[in-house]
A protein has these predicted regions:
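HTH-adjacent hinge/linker in prokaryotic transcriptional regulators
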Residues: 2-9, 24, 37-38, 48-130, ...
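Residues in the helix-turn-helix
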Residues: 45
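Alpha-helical residues within helix-turn-helix
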Residues: 27-28, 33-34
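C-terminal regulatory/effector modules of DNA-binding transcriptional regulators
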Residues: 126, 139, 143-144, 154-251
Length: 251
């Protein structure tokens, strides 16, 4: 049997100290040099052990301050289901309410953004064709739990009251309801989930370690004429969320 890598042994040691209440939630850990000296390893080994525990939500790093024992954090249940599109209210807000968490989100919309090649392919338009791009940061009790970047062809919503997803009389109503307001009926959505490591920007926004595991969901909404009318890249951190799919059964 191969020997356990040193950083995994140190991670187990740090985890054990936390379990035995040597360090409590919110406590700052000793320096890497001190931990390394106590455990007989170099600082790089301690760093890798801490990065692993940060990605698992056991520790948290604070820029310019050090590494701390993470406060207990409820893992958020993220439900994916077409049946959850409601005329009023947000599915995300419903999920958070069920967990007794305060739901909120921050967004930024840029109109008339040229579609990159991949987005153009997903929307069935020419590369460079104008789109409305909206970025979201979803929060549960003020802590980020999900990122999303949405793209809608300007040719579909331009000049209408729903051109801005988070502005106007239909602000925050969701893709299905907003499209219905301009006579576009959504028939179905296609989602492609894929595990990967977080980028540096995603890690910073989500408060997780760089390269921590996330689930990247590519979602596209289609009209009843089989036309793609919105596509989004949704990023969910594995350490903080569990993704559940509800599949309606029609009889």
């Amino acid at each position: 049997m191969s020997e356990q890598p040193p950083y995994l042994r140190i991670a187990d040691e740090l985890r054990q100290r936390i379990a035995e209440h040597v360090w409590e939630p919110g406590d700052r850990l000793p320096s890497r040099a001190q931990i390394g000296q106590e455990c007989g390893v170099g600082e790089n080994v301690v760093r890798r052990a801490q990065e692993l525990l940060i990605s698992q939500g056991v520790l948290e790093g604070r820029a310019g301050s050090g590494t701390y024992v993470a406060e207990p954090r409820q893992r958020v249940r993220v439900v994916r289901s077409s049946a959850r599109e409601q005329p009023s209210g947000s599915p995300f807000r419903q999920d958070m309410k069920a967990l007794r968490l305060q739901a909120d989100w921050e967004s930024r919309t840029d109109a008339k953004v040229p579609a990159p090649a991949e987005i153009a392919t997903r929307l069935g338009i020419a590369e460079g064709e104008l789109c409305v791009r909206t970025t979201y940061e979803f929060l549960a009790d003020g802590k980020p739990v999900q990122l999303s970047t949405s793209w809608e062809p300007y040719a579909v919503t331009g000049g209408t009251l729903v051109v801005l997803p988070e502005g106007g009389p239909h602000a925050g109503a969701g893709v299905v309801n907003r499209m219905a307001a301009i006579g576009v009926t959504i028939s179905h959505a296609v989602e492609q989930p894929e595990p990967r490591h977080a980028t540096a920007e995603e890690a910073s926004l989500l408060g997780i370690q760089k390269a921590a595991l996330v689930t990247h969901i590519r979602r596209t909404y289609y009209s009843d004429e089989s036309r793609p009318v919105e596509t989004a890249d949704i990023v969910v951190p594995a350490a903080h969320c569990e993704i559940v799919y509800e599949i309606p059964i029609n009889r």
